[in-house]
Amino acid sequence: MEDFVRQCFNPMIVELAEKAMKEYGEDPKIETNKFAAICTHLEVCFMYSDFHFIDERSESIIVESGDPNALLKHRFEIIEGRDRTMAWTVVNSICNTTGVEKPKFLPDLYDYKENRFIEIGVTRREVHTYYLEKANKIKSEETHIHIFSFTGEEMATKADYTLDEESRARIKTRLFTIRQEMASRGLWDSFVNPREAKRQLKKNLKSLEPCADLQTKVSHRTSPALKTLEPMWMDSNRTAALRASFLKCQKK
């Protein structure tokens, strides 16, 4: 699974996922299913944001190419992928500026058009089951929830899907592609079956036993990739980075 993740996802996403896991003392080489899940979730968050801007009249528009110097503000603030301290700093700044209620848990995005935080979910199970779990955890009507599955299903708060149909179709297609690529490598069953995943985890732990003395200290240096997540007006570098974040899986 680890090899698949490094082949399938953009290096920027892989780096962010590794950093997030190490922040919680988790090892991507051992908890490979979680590694894959985090990368998938990060990519969906990037794709959710990509191409969506607000113009000088505060109207929401979709721009796939054009003048990089145009005064276009990104519609979505990406919170997922930042270290916790920076993420809460961004959330507090948004709340102070907009007056929206501060969430109890870190959300994934902020929508400047609808003035609400968004929690993105990607599930291997039934969408309604995962949606209810998210809603029960968050317990806030202020945070919008949007759930995607690997089978093309989705569910959102009050059936408000935020994005246009084409943008959501891109996300669904990417998730289906990831599922197909996993299946072709014999990885899908362990990804969705907890019992099989536990067996694989034990196997991974056993294979890494001789390396138990390896350094595990977490680095607190800011990843260069995080610079692409800073609030900013539209520029060609960020657009290119976001475009790269949903490259198709590379074949072996």
UniProtKB/Swiss-Prot annotation:
Taxonomic classification: Viruses, Riboviria, Orthornavirae, Negarnaviricota, Polyploviricotina
Domain of life (superkingdom): Viruses
Signal peptide residues on this chain, from the entry's feature table: none
Location relative to the cell: Host cytoplasm; Host nucleus
Cited function: Plays a major role in the shutoff of the host protein expression by cleaving mRNAs probably via an endonuclease activity. This host shutoff allows the virus to escape from the host antiviral response. Hijacks host RNA splicing machinery to selectively target host RNAs containing introns for destruction. This may explain the preferential degradation of RNAs that have undergone co- or post-transcriptional processing.
UniProt remark on domains: The probable endonuclease active site in the N-terminus and the basic amino acid cluster in the C-terminus are important for the shutoff activity. The C-terminus acts as a nuclear localization signal. The C-terminus is recruited to host protein complexes involved in nuclear Pol II RNA processing.
Site (described: Important for efficient shutoff activity): K202, K203, K206
Active-site residues, Swiss-Prot/TrEMBL: E80, D108
Subunit comment: Interacts with host RACK1.
Name of the molecule in the record: Protein PA-X
Protein family (similarity comment): Belongs to the influenza viruses PA-X family.
Protein keywords: Decay of host mRNAs by virus, Eukaryotic host gene expression shutoff by virus, Host cytoplasm, Host gene expression shutoff by virus, Host mRNA suppression by virus, Host nucleus, Host-virus interaction
Source organism of this protein record: Influenza A virus (strain A/Vietnam/1203/2004 H5N1)
Sites marked Important for efficient shutoff activity and nuclear localization: R195, K198, R199
